[in-house]
Amino acid sequence: HNTMNDVIGEYPNNPSSNDQFYDDGEIIRGLFSWHGYHSSADPPENLGGPDFGGDGHLGAAQFVGVATLHADTSPSNNSNDINQPTTTWFITSDDPTTSGNLQYNGTKSTKEYVDYMTVGHPEQSHSEIVGTGNANQFNDPRTGSNPGGTSQGIGFGPYDLEPGDSIRIVLAEGASGLSRSMCYKVGQNWKNQVHTDELPESSDLHQHMMNNYHRSSDSHSYYKNAWVFTGVDSIINVFKLAKK
């Protein structure tokens, strides 16, 4: 229930401050997710999934994500359409539209197509709406509920396909973040409050994550969260490697 989802590169012609770019200057069209705050965490410092009752090691410091490397412009034009994907709305699990497979229900299928597959880009991503709040308490503004947590959606098109036509879309999936040894080192240092001045090298994107998703009131966890959010640069590097 506490997954956080963000999207970058939705508007190639009008990049936002947190958008990223490949070495050749092309915008990265990506989405990534991480372990966010949960209202039931006790103590409420659960970014990175620290082992509160044990040695403090981090059990959920990784970022997972997907990047669009290529999407055909049309069935007859295989040039890369930089404006794809055209839909990046988040999706709440187990609500009436996303639960129950009723492929022959025309009403439900139409709602899936209109509300999820072709809905476009939200004004704010899921993570931008949640901010430093508890991700498990987020409610989808379209339904007013969130029974099963939030996932990131992605949709391409629309394409007009005749019989025999095809579209080529290339995606890269990845996961990255702190190594196992660093998860233990950072978590143990955090729990014992030692060496907390040993902060990671920051980037513009890393600072964006700290500014928007670290609770400034939680000075006790600044060190831990600073290391956890290095995972965002790690997943961007995975996307760049996939492009090569």
Ranges and model annotations:
Residues H1-K244:
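Extracellular/surface-associated beta-sandwich interaction domains
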